[in-house]
From Swiss-Prot:
Subunit structure: Monomer.
Source organism of this protein record: Alkaliphilus oremlandii (strain OhILAs) (Clostridium oremlandii (strain OhILAs))
Binding site for ATP: A12, V13, G14, K15, T16, T17, R119, R156
Sorted UniProt keywords: Amino-acid biosynthesis, Aromatic amino acid biosynthesis, ATP-binding, Cytoplasm, Kinase, Magnesium, Metal-binding, Nucleotide-binding, Transferase
Intracellular or extracellular location(s): Cytoplasm
Record protein name field: Shikimate kinase
Main localization category: cytoplasm
Primary role: Catalyzes the specific phosphorylation of the 3-hydroxyl group of shikimic acid using ATP as a cosubstrate.
Source taxonomy: Bacteria, Bacillati, Bacillota, Clostridia, Peptostreptococcales
Annotated positions binding Mg(2+): T16
Cofactor(s) essential for the protein: Mg(2+)
GO BP term, pick one: chorismate biosynthetic process
Family the entry assigns: Belongs to the shikimate kinase family.
Cofactor binding note of this UniProt entry: Binds 1 Mg(2+) ion per subunit.
Pathway: Metabolic intermediate biosynthesis; chorismate biosynthesis; chorismate from D-erythrose 4-phosphate and phosphoenolpyruvate: step 5/7
Amino acid sequence: MVKNIVLVGFMAVGKTTLGKLLADQLDYNFIDLDLFIEKKESMSISEIFRLKGEAYFRQKESEALDLLSDVEQSVIATGGGTVISEENRSKLKQIGRVIYLEAEPSWILTNIKRSAVIRPLLVDERKSMDKIIEILENRRLYYEGTSEIKIPVSHRTLEEIIKDIVCNI
């Protein structure tokens, strides 16, 4: 069995939801990197961005990956921007098998609108689709270059996606 499974992909593609389901199916632990950071910092990701800035958050994200380097039998859901840092990309590959959950921009926007989660990088809703496309284009090569497996998630059921992941690990 794989030491760990690391889920990467854009915000709102289902990393947390799918990660929990996958962990249950594999009898693995589940770790949400953003929640891990929120507990360590005693504030939400939105508050960290607002009060301390993105650079501070990215540093805490990198430190969190260091702390998770020894975990085993875990599914780890990363933040959408974790792959921005070359150092983080290297750490993710060392932690476990990296799976890229790929989604279409329109599907991402639909999920964001349905979600109660505040997305710090998408505060202006009128510009959201353009911003999603821009950020996704900037990160796509990082997602693809870091991952061993790419799983399309748009317009698919959770069950279909989980089955696809399990068949590919």
